[in-house]
Amino acid sequence: SRAVADSWMDEVIKLCGRELVRAQIAICGKSTWSKRSLSQEDAPQTPRPVAEIVPSFINKDTETINMMSEFVANLPQELKLTLSEMQPALPQLQQYVPVLKDSSLLFEEFKKLIRNRQSEAADSSPSELKYLGLDTHSRKKRQLYSALANKCCHVGCTKRSLARFC
């Protein structure tokens, strides 16, 4: 089955305009589906909301930092000095332990910050996007796709090369 998928992706097509766009949509749908089916079971999974995912990471980080700070606190003084020379970031991490213990409060602030940034992004004018350097990346990506579209139209291209833009 994998060999069939690879040969399908290496097939050369010569399309222009709407036909190229339709092929791009079909390729992206099939390549995304095949990647998912190779990496996961075929059973569809419902995506978990961000509110469920982020706290688990915060809790894991909190547990790790708490464990490290307790471990370091119980070390003899000579080893603490050696450890701080080898791991200068550890004292910096320890300053965040009290903050991370209130991770639910921190997460609420984090969600507010995300909402504010999203509303600011919606209100941003193109000149502000240019100032932030956000327009350059998308322009380069469009130029690359335009060059590929010209190649697909005049010479032909593989489905794999189109799948890179999914």
From Swiss-Prot:
Heterodimer of a B chain and an A chain linked by two disulfide bonds. One of its GO terms (cellular component) is extracellular region. Residues 1-5 form the signal peptide. It comes from the Eukaryota. Keywords: Cleavage on pair of basic residues, Disulfide bond, Hormone, Secreted, Signal. Belongs to the insulin family. CDD domains: IlGF_relaxin_like. GO terms for molecular function: hormone activity. The gene is RNL2. This is Prorelaxin H2. Coiled coil: none annotated. It is found in: Secreted. Its main location: secreted. The keyword Disulfide bond applies. Residues 37-138 form a propeptide. The keyword Signal applies. Relaxin is an ovarian hormone that acts with estrogen to produce dilatation of the birth canal in many mammals. May be involved in remodeling of connective tissues during pregnancy, promoting growth of pubic ligaments and ripening of the cervix. Expressed in the corpus luteum of pregnancy and in the placenta. Disulfide bonds join C16-C153, C28-C166, C152-C157.
